[in-house]
């Protein structure tokens, strides 16, 4: 077997803000290294999910191996690990970054440095990587490459003269990028003779071969027939085959060695056995220490998912299990609701993640689902001294037992042109935000960096859309968790015909509870079909009703057959109708239709546009 020369390997990743042209640049790199023939080339080659290509975002990390003959005449092996760009997928990015030695930081020549660029940059710095700034999209008419290069130097401290000007669309400058990868990014270190130490940075599920973990080997080697052990669970498996990633798919090889990026098949049936971020080692010669710094992904947003047809409950469970194979951050547990039947309480990394999971369930598994309003995790300190976590607003303990409720806060970093600062500050004030820092950036395009702290729940719903509309699409944001703080929060129950609909319960700040409740009951009154009796819809905090709307009763015209005639006769018929309605009202049940749940999702969140 030919030994890989470590000095000829380069492992790198591309990081960028959403839409700065990362996937297009990756396409050009594949073309220039002749990894993909012109016939096979398609846009966003590495984005394998249909959804990724449709939305134009990268959701899962994926890897590819290409060879490049550099100007020095030597042939190098590049492992490119593509990373997601959206803030929800920060953990995926951190794992992909752990597997490489250097990164290309792509910045759009017309947009400049944006919030997520900054977040990703700090992550790469934490890993101690070599960072090559690439100013992309220089073919655009409104590109300002020099100015952006200076902005990169000012904001990120990367020397402007090291920046490479390129265009993923035309291919200009890509050759220069490939040379820079060879020159500037260090080769991997590692001893193939040492005990095996491999980091799992992703995994996919294959119906025939089970879970296929994607690995970066730091030490040792692995070949078919080896007995491997998963570090955190201690489970052992026998390797069937190992191999590398080519743009055409997975290709088996004889062995993988330190410094390489590849995959293995070992008949692993349960995804929980290979958590992303775990270390794989040999059963008979384990490595003394696993790869550091990994924590299981922690969901921060929870929502209930219920099948429209209750018969699909089992199908939904299987679908969630399958998605979890590829998505370490997704959690779910069964829950039941009087209004919606049986479903699951699912945990996500953020709203985009929740949306994508729901869309994949509906698309790939043909399910139709109802999602309840997403909520964050509250911590409740009880008078007894214990602390409980609340994932579902309906589970909030009785107010008499509560000492205080803590809500999660986030630290927001917002980049915006100067003229929108006023309206953005107004929006953030509305969302109970607190200004921490404000920073004017150099350059002709007067841009400002705002740093705010705000309750996560306020940012959850329509904040991103409102941010974009207030700033005409120019502002960008990134957030990170900033711990818990006490808040004046109340649980609001929604009652339809005197019965609490648990799926509509929400937790809100006391000042905002009335406005949100009002919007929700009005919306429900519009969408709940009229019954033969009057249906009151109420919102209550504890025993106190704070908002009410009524769905008027449908009335049959009982006087239609009385032509003229005595008034007492008419009265008798009307009284009889009234009696019947009273009886109906006492025993009548109101079905809350599906649209009602969907309507409520939008209702309580549309606060008056400032």
UniProtKB/Swiss-Prot annotation:
Keyword Transport: no
Main location: membrane
Cellular localization per UniProt: Cell inner membrane
Pfam families given in the database record: EFG_C, GTP_EFTU, GTP_EFTU_D2, LepA_C
Coiled-coil boundaries: none
Domain tr-type G: 7-189
Entries under InterPro entries matching the protein: EF-4, EFG_III/V, EFG_V-like, EFTu-like_2, G_TR_CS, LepA_C_sf, LepA_CTD, LepA_IV
GO biological process: one example: positive regulation of translation
Gene Ontology CC entries for this record: plasma membrane
Transmembrane region(s): none
EC number of this enzyme: 3.6.5.n1
Keywords annotated in UniProt: Cell inner membrane, Cell membrane, GTP-binding, Hydrolase, Membrane, Nucleotide-binding, Protein biosynthesis
Topological type in the membrane: Peripheral membrane protein
CDD domains with a match to the protein in the record: EF4_II, EF4_III, LepA, lepA_C
Catalytic activity: GTP + H2O = GDP + phosphate + H(+)
PANTHER family reported in the protein's UniProt record: TRANSLATION FACTOR GUF1 HOMOLOG, CHLOROPLASTIC, TRANSLATION FACTOR GUF1-RELATED
Biological role: Required for accurate and efficient protein synthesis under certain stress conditions. May act as a fidelity factor of the translation reaction, by catalyzing a one-codon backward translocation of tRNAs on improperly translocated ribosomes. Back-translocation proceeds from a post-translocation (POST) complex to a pre-translocation (PRE) complex, thus giving elongation factor G a second chance to translocate the tRNAs correctly. Binds to ribosomes in a GTP-dependent manner.
HAMAP family, sorted: LepA
Family of the protein in this entry: Belongs to the TRAFAC class translation factor GTPase superfamily. Classic translation factor GTPase family. LepA subfamily.
Protein name: Elongation factor 4
Taxonomic classification: Bacteria, Thermotogati, Deinococcota, Deinococci, Thermales
């Amino acid at each position: 077997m030919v030994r890989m020369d470590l000095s000829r390997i380069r492992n790198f990743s591309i990081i960028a803000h959403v839409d700065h042209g990362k996937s297009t640049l990756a396409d050009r790199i594949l073309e220039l290294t002749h990894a993909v023939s012109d016939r096979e080339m398609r846009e966003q080659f590495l984005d394998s999910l249909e959804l990724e290509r449709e939305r134009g975002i990268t959701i899962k990390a994926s890897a590819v191996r290409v060879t490049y003959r550099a100007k020095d005449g030597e042939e190098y092996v590049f492992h490119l690990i593509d990373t997601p760009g959206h803030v929800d997928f920060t953990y995926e990015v951190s794992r992909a970054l752990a597997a490489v030695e250097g990164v290309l930081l792509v910045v759009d020549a017309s947009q400049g440095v944006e919030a997520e660029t900054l977040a990703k940059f700090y992550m790469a710095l934490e890993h101690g990587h070599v960072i090559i700034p690439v100013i992309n999209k220089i073919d655009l008419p409104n590109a300002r490459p020099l100015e952006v290069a200076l902005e990169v130097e000012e904001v990120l401290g990367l020397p402007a003269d090291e920046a490479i000007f390129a265009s993923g669309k035309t291919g200009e400058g890509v050759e220069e990028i490939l040379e820079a990868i060879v020159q500037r990014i260090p080769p991997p270190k590692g001893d193939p003779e040492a005990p095996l130490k491999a980091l799992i940075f992703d995994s996919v599920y294959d119906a025939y071969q089970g879970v296929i973990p994607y690995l970066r080997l730091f030490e040792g080697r692995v070949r078919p027939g080896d007995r491997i052990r998963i570090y955190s669970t201690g489970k052992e498996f026998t390797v069937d085959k190992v191999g590398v990633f080519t743009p055409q798919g997975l290709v088996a090889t004889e062995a993988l060695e330190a410094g390489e990026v590849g995959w293995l098949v070992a008949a692993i049936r349960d995804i929980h056995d290979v958590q992303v971020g775990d270390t794989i080692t040999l059963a008979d010669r384990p490595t003394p220490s696993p790869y550091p710094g990994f924590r299981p992904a922690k969901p921060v947003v929870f929502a209930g998912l219920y099948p429209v047809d209750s018969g699909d409950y089992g199908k939904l469970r299987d679908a969630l299990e399958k998605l979890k194979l590829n998505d370490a951050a997704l959690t779910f547990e069964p829950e039941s609701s009087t209004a919606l039947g049986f479903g699951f309480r699912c945990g996500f990394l953020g709203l985009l993640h929740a949306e994508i999971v729901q869309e994949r369930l509906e698309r790939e598994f043909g399910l139709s689902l109802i999602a309840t309003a997403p909520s964050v995790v509250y911590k409740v300190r009880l008078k007894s001294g214990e602390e409980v976590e609340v994932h579902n607003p309906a589970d909030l303990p009785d107010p008499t037992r509560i000492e205080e409720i803590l809500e999660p806060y986030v630290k927001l970093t917002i980049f915006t042109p100067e003229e929108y600062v006023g309206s953005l500050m107004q929006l953030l004030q509305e969302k109970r935000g607190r200004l921490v820092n404000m920073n004017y950036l150099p350059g002709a395009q007067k841009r400002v960096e705002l740093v705010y702290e705000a309750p996560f729940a306020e940012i959850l719903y329509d904040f991103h859309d409102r941010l974009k509309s207030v700033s005409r699409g120019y502002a960008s944001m990134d957030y990170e968790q900033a711990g818990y703080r006490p808040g004046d929060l109340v649980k609001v129950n929604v009652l339809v015909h005197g019965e609490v609909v648990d799926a509509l319960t929400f937790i809100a700040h006391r000042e905002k509870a009335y406005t949100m409740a009002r919007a929700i009951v009005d919306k429900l009154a519009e969408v709940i079909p009229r019954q033969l009796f009057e249906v009151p819809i109420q919102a209550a905090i504890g025993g106190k009703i704070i908002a009410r709307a009524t769905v008027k009763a449908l009335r049959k015209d009982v006087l239609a057959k009385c032509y003229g005639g005595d008034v007492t006769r008419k009265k008798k018929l009307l009284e009889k109708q009234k009696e019947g309605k009273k009886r109906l009202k006492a025993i009548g049940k109101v079905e809350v239709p599906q649209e009602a749940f969907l309507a409520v999702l939008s209702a309580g969140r549309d606060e008056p546009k400032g």
